[in-house]
């Protein structure tokens, strides 16, 4: 007998068939999922739970068991039985039934699938249209099962046929997944209509529209719109072919209509789009005789209507113009005459009935509107209760109504004439005109005020404690802030118009009391003079030390600086000398003036110089108080000299100001004027510390800086950075100290040797030289062992590694971990 040959139709026994046999796969379709997995980021390697729908004979389950992590859950289901597979759970069921869903839930427990695979197809052979629809319906059922079991971000791979329902399925996939892509792996035959859709990133919506998974909704055929006959008429060159066969009930391709019927038709464009020819009417027709007399009825037009499919846009326009003119000639478009209808006036009963109907309709509208509003309120209340928004909406309305009467009213203050007192900062009550006219006494609840004041004081104390704790926490966390706090930079006040807070507050209180008690003009003048005296303030102590300690102000001279710092003391001396000695005429005739350069004197004249000519009494007539004042001045000047090293120009603004003062661009009056701005005279009394600190930090005048000042500060910072750190300086100092100690020791020993009379001078010199060599000899440091990592060519090496000289030590990662463990244990025992 001859050897039988197996059929090889459509290339079924291709290379993937033999590869599947060699690899042990149950079908050649195994390579389809392998290629899809490689193309789309190896999603199977990341999946712990995989469901294979329509899994028979189980080739995709085999691939999943090989690629998925160990101990993964792989479930295969099909309508036909599947042979048992290692590391897989298989059962027989129809994926469109509820039994399949219950069995899947029983196997998966509370788990969710990371990947759902579907490679099912119906029994084909009935017809291509029927087979394609059945495949699409099966794919939709698989998607429905996948949606119930997929985890968020999961993957769904399915097989579908290219058919008219393909776009509908793709739209459904795009609603449920972030990325949807169709592919055809190389293992799929080219003659096959199958393609695979990979859906990644399942969105897991909280609410699912059931119509997305309903076959009747997804595969519903929408009615096609009417043909675009306008395009056929106005753009006949562009033809769209639709190969869909004949229309129902119409099996002819040639359509003809009489010309007069076309003229009488109300829809000429759609009619022309469906016709092939317009037939000419008989010659004895009365209407046609009228139309033939028209100028547009030419022999060319009669030839054009014999074949409408070859006409162009111009010909169709000419035909439509002829139709319009023909309708005018035949009177088809004539407007109907309007008939006037007389309306009888309404009787009294009819008028009353009409008004009643209107009122009834208005009442119904109001009732509907009120019902609608009540429904909206109920709906809002339901929403608020669902969102736990149960707070009463009317809360605070009563308090607002009560407090509205006590609000400050500027118009009332202007009418009552109390605006002037309010502008001076007096906390007065503003009363209404009626209360002032009645002169009623306004009684306050003293207990309520006391309680409210106690609560306010308690709240302020709590705020102060919280601010202090915040400052302490910040000081512990931030070293720079801690250093600033120790230096006192944090608490420095920018304005020093009053020498002490106590003095300023006392004076202000006295001024307030004085103004409330007296109303005469003389008292007001004295009060104004007192305020002006308070605002006059010289440079502060720190400012004087600053100008005295910097060399950049050397042009002013030490004597001028001394005189400027103690101008008030000199004035006091003058008054004292006049009262004590009584030589006013001699003192006034013989003043002792300062020696100032011509350039300085010119500046003094033009700029209201900072220096003042002060007459002094002769030395022999000076009293004890004068000598004491001179001692105080010299003592303060020496103290300023002592503090010179402590003052430093550290900011660009300070350096800019120093340059301007040194070069004569600014004098004392300019500095005083710049110090008076909108932030200068703010009342800081009885304010919490946190508020004052915030005001200091934010309420500042931004002063301009110069390029030269910035460069000077930058150069200064460079010099500071170039200095060695404290540890290096300390080490150098210790080294020098040790050298000095050795030198002293050598000196003592050499003195002892020189005092020894038993030795000769040569022996003494030799011993001293030996001592010097011994002390100056450098200490030898032990060479450190070279560490060689046991890796690469040095792994498992016995003997000295290549290129290593001297002592060496072999190390590896295990030794490193052991050393870390030993350090950790030692640290633990120390605790």
UniProtKB/Swiss-Prot annotation:
One GO MF term: rRNA (guanosine-2'-O-)-methyltransferase activity
Gene Ontology terms: cellular component: nucleolus; preribosome, large subunit precursor
Top class in the EC scheme: transferase
BP term (GO), one: maturation of 5.8S rRNA from tricistronic rRNA transcript (SSU-rRNA, 5.8S rRNA, LSU-rRNA)
Protein residues bound to S-adenosyl-L-methionine: 58, 60, 78, 94, 119
Function: Required for proper assembly of pre-ribosomal particles during the biogenesis of the 60S ribosomal subunit.
Assembly and interaction partners: Component of the nucleolar and nucleoplasmic pre-60S ribosomal particle.
Family, similarity comment: Belongs to the class I-like SAM-binding methyltransferase superfamily. RNA methyltransferase RlmE family. SPB1 subfamily.
Protein name from the UniProt record: AdoMet-dependent rRNA methyltransferase SPB1
Gene it is expressed from: SPB1
């Amino acid at each position: 007998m001859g050897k039988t040959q197996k059929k090889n139709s459509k290339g079924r026994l291709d290379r993937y068939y033999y590869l599947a046999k060699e690899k042990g796969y149950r079908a050649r379709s195994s390579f389809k999922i392998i290629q899809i997995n490689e193309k789309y980021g190896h999603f199977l390697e990341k999946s712990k739970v995989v469901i294979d729908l329509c899994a028979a004979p189980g080739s995709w389950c085999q691939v999943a068991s090989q690629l998925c992590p160990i101990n993964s859950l792989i479930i295969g289901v099909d309508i036909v039985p599947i042979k048992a597979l290692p590391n897989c759970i298989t059962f027989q069921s129809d994926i469109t039934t509820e039994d399949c869903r219950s069995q899947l839930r029983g196997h998966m427990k509370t788990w969710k699938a990371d990947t759902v695979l579907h490679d099912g197809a119906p029994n084909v052979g009935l017809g291509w249209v029927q087979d394609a629809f059945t495949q699409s319906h099966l794919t939709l059922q698989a998607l429905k099962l996948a949606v119930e079991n997929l985890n968020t971000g999961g993957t769904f791979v399915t097989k579908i046929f290219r058919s008219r329902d393909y776009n509908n399925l793709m739209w459904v996939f795009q609603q449920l997944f972030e990325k949807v892509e169709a592919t055809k792996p190389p293992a799929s035959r080219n003659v096959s209509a199958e393609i695979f859709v990979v859906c990644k990133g399942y969105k897991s919506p909280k609410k699912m529209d059931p119509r997305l998974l309903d076959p009747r909704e997804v595969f519903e055929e929408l009615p096609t719109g009417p043909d675009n006959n306008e395009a056929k008429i106005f753009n006949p060159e562009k033809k769209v072919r639709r190969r869909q066969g004949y229309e129902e009930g119409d099996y002819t391709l040639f359509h003809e209509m009489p010309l007069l019927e076309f003229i009488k038709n109300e829809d000429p464009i759609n009619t022309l789009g469906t016709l092939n020819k317009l037939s000419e009417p008989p010659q004895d027709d009365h209407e046609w005789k009228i139309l033939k007399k028209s100028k547009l009825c030419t022999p060319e037009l009669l030839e054009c209507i014999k074949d409408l499919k070859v006409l162009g846009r111009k010909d169709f326009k000419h035909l439509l113009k002829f139709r319009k003119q023909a309708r005018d000639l035949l009177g088809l478009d004539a407007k109907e005459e309007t008939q006037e209808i007389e309306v009888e006036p309404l009787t009294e009963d009819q008028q009353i009935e009409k008004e009643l109907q209107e009122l009834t309709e208005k009442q119904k509208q109001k009732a509907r509107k009120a019902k609608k509003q009540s429904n909206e309120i109920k709906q809002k209340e339901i929403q608020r209760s669902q969102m736990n928004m149960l707070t009463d909406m009317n809360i605070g309305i009563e308090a607002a109504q009560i407090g509205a009467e006590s609000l400050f009213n500027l118009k009332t203050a202007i009418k009552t004439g109390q605006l002037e007192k309010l502008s001076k900062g007096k906390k007065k009550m503003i009363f209404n005109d009626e209360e002032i006219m009645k002169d009623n006494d306004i009684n306050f609840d003293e207990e309520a005020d006391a309680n409210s004041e106690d609560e306010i004081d308690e709240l302020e104390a709590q705020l102060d404690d919280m601010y202090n704790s915040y400052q302490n926490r910040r000081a512990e966390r931030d070293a720079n802030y801690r250093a600033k706090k120790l230096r006192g930079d944090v608490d420095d006040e920018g304005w020093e118009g009053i020498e002490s807070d106590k003095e300023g507050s006392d004076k202000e209180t006295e001024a307030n009391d004085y103004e409330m008690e007296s109303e005469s003009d003389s008292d007001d003048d004295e009060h104004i003079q007192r305020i002006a005296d308070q605002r006059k303030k010289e440079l502060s102590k720190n400012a004087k030390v600053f100008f005295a300690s910097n060399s950049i102000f050397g042009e002013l001279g030490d004597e001028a600086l001394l005189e400027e710092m103690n101008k008030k003391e000199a004035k006091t001396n003058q008054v004292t000398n006049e009262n004590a000695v009584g030589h006013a005429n001699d003192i006034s005739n013989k003043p002792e003036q300062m020696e100032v350069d011509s350039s300085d004197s010119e500046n003094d004249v033009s700029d209201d110089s900072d220096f003042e000519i002060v007459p002094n009494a002769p030395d022999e007539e000076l009293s004890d108080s004068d000598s004491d004042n001179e001692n105080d001045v010299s003592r303060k000047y020496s103290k300023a000299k002592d503090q010179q090293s402590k003052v430093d120009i550290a900011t660009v603004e300070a350096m800019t100001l120093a340059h301007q003062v040194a070069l004569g661009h600014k004098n004392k009056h300019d500095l005083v004027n710049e110090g008076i701005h909108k932030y200068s005279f703010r009342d800081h009394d009885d304010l919490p510390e946190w508020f004052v600190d915030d005001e200091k930090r934010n309420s500042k005048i931004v002063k301009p800086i110069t390029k030269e000042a910035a460069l000077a500060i930058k150069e200064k910072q460079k010099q500071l950075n170039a200095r060695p750190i404290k540890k290096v300086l300390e080490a150098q100092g210790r080294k020098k100290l040790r050298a000095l100690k050795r030198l002293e020791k050598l000196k003592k020993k050499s003195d002892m040797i020189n005092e020894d009379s038993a030795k000769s001078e040569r022996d003494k010199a030799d011993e001293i030289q030996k001592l010097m060599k011994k002390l100056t000899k450098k200490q030898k440091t032990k060479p450190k062992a070279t560490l060689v990592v046991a890796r690469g060519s040095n792994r498992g090496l016995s003997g000295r590694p290549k290129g290593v000289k001297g002592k060496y030590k072999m190390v590896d990662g295990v030794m490193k971990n052991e050393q870390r463990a030993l350090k950790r244990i030692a640290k633990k025992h120390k605790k």
